[in-house]
Amino acid sequence: MAMQGIESQDWAWFTFSRVRVLRELADGRSERDAAERLGIAYSSVRSVVEELKNKTGLHSVREIGHWWRGQAGEWLAWCAEQAGAAQKGYGTGGD
């Protein structure tokens, strides 16, 4: 399973729409099940999966789901940093 590293500046490519699909795949769902749960067309999920394969260098839905389970926290930290929330402790109850 060859994976390309994602540089921090590449996290912007992972839109919320793509991440919603990634979450479903990480939970072990098929593309068809992901589409149904998200209320979007199967073809839309297929398009996202093909984009993800190109971006990550992975070859299967299962590999992508496994990869995302290891990357989601880093992406979330990047989002918090972009919003300025990482340094200020937003959401910790100590504002």
Predicted feature descriptions by range:
Residues 1-10:
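Short, Lys/Arg-enriched N-terminal segment that forms or immediately precedes the first helix
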Residues 12-18:
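Short helix-coil-helix linker/hinge
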Residues 13, 26-27, 56:
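Helix-turn-helix/winged-helix DNA-binding modules
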Residues 18-25, 64:
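Short alpha-helical "packing" element that flanks the helix-turn-helix/winged-helix DNA-binding module
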Residues 30-63:
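Recognition helix of helix-turn-helix DNA-binding domains
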